[in-house]
Amino acid sequence: ILRDTLHEHPFHSVEKWVQEVCWRRYWKGWLERRPDVWDSWRRRVRELHETLHEATRQRVKAVAAGESGVACMDAIVQELIATGYVHNNARMWWASYWIHAERLPWELGADVYYRYLLDADPASNTLSWRWVAGLQTPGKTYLVRASNIEKYAPDLLISHRAGIERIADGAIAPVIASEFANTTRQALIDYPAVVPDRGRRIGIWLHADDLLPEVRPLANLTLVSVAAFSQELEACHTPALSKRSIAAQEEALADGLARSAAHFSCPTEQSTHADPAACLAAWASKHGLEEVVAFAPTVGPVADLLPPVQQRLDKS
């Protein structure tokens, strides 16, 4: 991605883009060594939805819907819900407002972003929220300030001034969140870098963590079929992802399948079945596959599917 970007554009015009790509790769590497941070966030979201006091539950619902009473913050989350995107600065402001002004659990704010952002990424989203909350760099928080918004997004304040006193400079005291995750580094799993073509009936499971099977090390395989399962990112997530996020995922998978069909000259299929593990096993059985190959997923929802997928394949 960076090579192609820099081939087409001068560095000064894409520097921020390059930085964001590098940050995403850094976050992915950090989370890969500390998978319990992802697991802990998932557990906390479930626990909080079950145990929140009713008043806090209603406030979570109001702020997440853009009904907090601070107009510029409400405009940010309303744009997110409507489009699936907001500028990176706005993401930081709203996250800080949620945690330090509203004093709501960071885990539930991260869940709002994860459900609505079209570019939601398990590592970048979870760890960025932890950073704002003072967990990623222990004790270092990020506080939203009206003067900062006025500097970088003056039009936002001009048209949305109601409640601005709540984020005036010096009005917000930081909240240091409690740490629930085990952040001890773990060894990385050593996956094979080459898949030998042993003349067996092979199929590729194409998933959202890597949509370039036509690039090595899988590029030279002779395949029976390639399949993708649109519910893989949603299967383990409650509440459900937004319809816009699901549609974006389905579009990306369809594009990957189209390129796979052209490159490998084999049939492809895309399923929207609610149980991707069962559907994957049925696909393997239907085509008489002897091996199912996939790129190793990074820590996140696709990796969470590996145990049930393995269990289903072992039974088929």
PLM region spans:
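Trp/Phe/Arg-rich N-terminal binding region typifying the photolyase-homology
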Residues: I1-Q19, W23, K28-G29, R33-H49, ...
